[in-house]
Each structure stands twice: as structure tokens, then as C-alpha cells.
Amino acid sequence: MIPIILYGKENETSVDKALRRACDSLRKINKGKEFCIFQYDECDIEDFKNSKGIFVFKGSLGFKRDVIIPKGFIAVVSANNHSAASILRKIDVFAITCGTSPKDTMSISSLDYLSVVVSLQRIIRNIDGEVIEPQDFIVHLKEETAIYPLLTALTVFVLCNKDQNENIISF
């Protein structure tokens, strides 16, 4: 099981919905793998201390308390989320930024109504430590999705997907 922990306002559901669609696609490609989404304030972080996983910062953080990100987790954050960036500066966790700037790790290359090209701008390692080279991903959307939830969901997809040749994705 790969845990995905969401940190932010519970009523902000756009990231949750996009992640659920991405996880459904991942289950079809990576048969036998399970992906579980948890809300930070509803789970015990100690349960994940020996796990690999993904920690996603939502656009609005809401509650203020010390954030603990398990050691084997990769953080995913919007480049515009200054509160999350402040949290990440205080702890030693690898983070992938998502946004519309060429400085971001995952960035929009082109966009139309239900199709998006997203560029991975630099080398990253997936959840198993395997190298993923810079490349473009074509995403066919089943419904309109805002930019940050889309980038977050695609980043989780790329980090968890075993088939690194899979660069045309639907969710």
C-alpha cells in the first residue's frame, strides 16, 4: 500500500477528487498495488514511520500545528503556497513543486479544455528510488480540473507508476 497524506483545509476537495481519479488510473496500470488517501488531521503519523509515501499540501492549509512528514515520504507542493514552503524549509524533506513556471519541477506546457501537456522539468526519483528523466506527459481529462489539483494528481501518478514509458494518461 502506498499512503498519500493530504495536509490542508478539509473543505478544499479539488485536490482530493483529482487524486482519486489518478489513483484509479494507477490501479489499472499497476495491478495489485493499492493507494490510500488520508487526511493529515485524521491519521496517526506514527503509523507511517517506516513507510514510503507522498505528502501533498493542499492550496489552503487552514490549521496551524507542527507538521510531521514521515522520513520516507516525498512532499508535493504548489510553488505559490508560501505557507507550505515555510513549513518545508524547517524540515528535511524532498519536495516537488508544481506550477506554471519553468522553475517548477512539474509545469504546464500546453492546455486546452480536456487535454493538457505537463512537463517534468528535471530528474526526480519515484517512490521506489528509480530515476525519472525530464519528459512530457499528455493528460486526457474526463472532467475539467483546476491547474494545481491536476499537477498534484499527475505528480502522484508519476511518482507511483511502475511503467515509466506510460506518458499518455487519462483520469
Regions found by a protein language model. Name each.
Residues M1-V76, S83-F94:
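Phosphate-binding loop of NTP-binding sites
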Residues F55-F57, I74-V77, F94-T97, L114-V118, ...:
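Short, low-complexity, polar/charged sequence segments that are solvent-exposed and flexible
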Residues S78-H82, S86-K103, I108-S115:
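Conserved catalytic-core segment of NTP-binding enzymes
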Residues T100-F171:
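Adenine nucleotide phosphate-binding catalytic loops in nucleotide-utilizing enzymes
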